[in-house]
């Protein structure tokens, strides 16, 4: 974060992230290769954070085989959430190593797979809490083949996957309403 002094934990987190960059992205590349070759569809590599724009190119796109790379669109600039939401709403699925893109996709009715990294905060637990456990993976406990298998299931039966995304959002909306009701009651009582 800008304007926040670094603490030793920041260096530990950065060291862990740096040591896992290739290994983690190799799993996503394996999934992308399988998706493109088996479906003939295009894939998009885009960043949720500004520092990830170049990272996506170097770690996801550049190492891909030429026959796959030709079907991968790399977003070379950072985008704002409303633009991401527009693209995600038209996507067959979203697969992300960041927490927020799957949420934006689900909100738009698009199936979304979240691949959590060990240095992410505990907020990733919310995916299991609101019913998206089938689409939640710990990067250290999964393979590119497992990611492709789950994505292939979405691709094979998009109606079922979209229904699951809507069900997840119903759960989210019910829980948000319940939370807001409790806050209102608490505010009225004070």
Where do the protein language model's features map onto the residues?
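Active-site anion-handling motifs in enzyme catalytic cores
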Residues: 1-190
């Amino acid at each position: 974060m800008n304007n926040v002094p670094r603490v030793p934990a920041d260096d530990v987190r950065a060291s862990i992230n740096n040591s896992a960059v290739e290994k983690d992205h190799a799993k996503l590349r394996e999934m992308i290769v399988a998706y493109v070759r088996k479906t003939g569809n295009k894939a998009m590599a885009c960043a949720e954070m500004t520092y990830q724009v170049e990272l996506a190119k170097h770690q996801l796109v550049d190492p891909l085989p030429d026959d796959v790379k030709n079907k991968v669109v790399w977003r070379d600039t950072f985008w704002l959430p409303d633009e991401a939401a527009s693209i995600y709403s038209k996507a067959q699925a979203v697969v992300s190593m960041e927490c927020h893109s799957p949420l934006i996709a689900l909100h738009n009715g698009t199936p979304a797979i979240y691949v959590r990294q060990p240095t992410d905060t505990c907020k990733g637990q919310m995916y299991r809490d609101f019913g998206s456990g089938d689409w939640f993976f710990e990067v250290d406990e999964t393979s590119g083949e497992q990611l492709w298998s789950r994505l292939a299931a979405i691709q094979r039966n998009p109606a079922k996957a979209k229904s699951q995304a809507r069900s997840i959002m119903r759960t989210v909306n019910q829980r948000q309403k319940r939370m807001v009701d409790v806050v209102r009651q608490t505010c009225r009582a004070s």
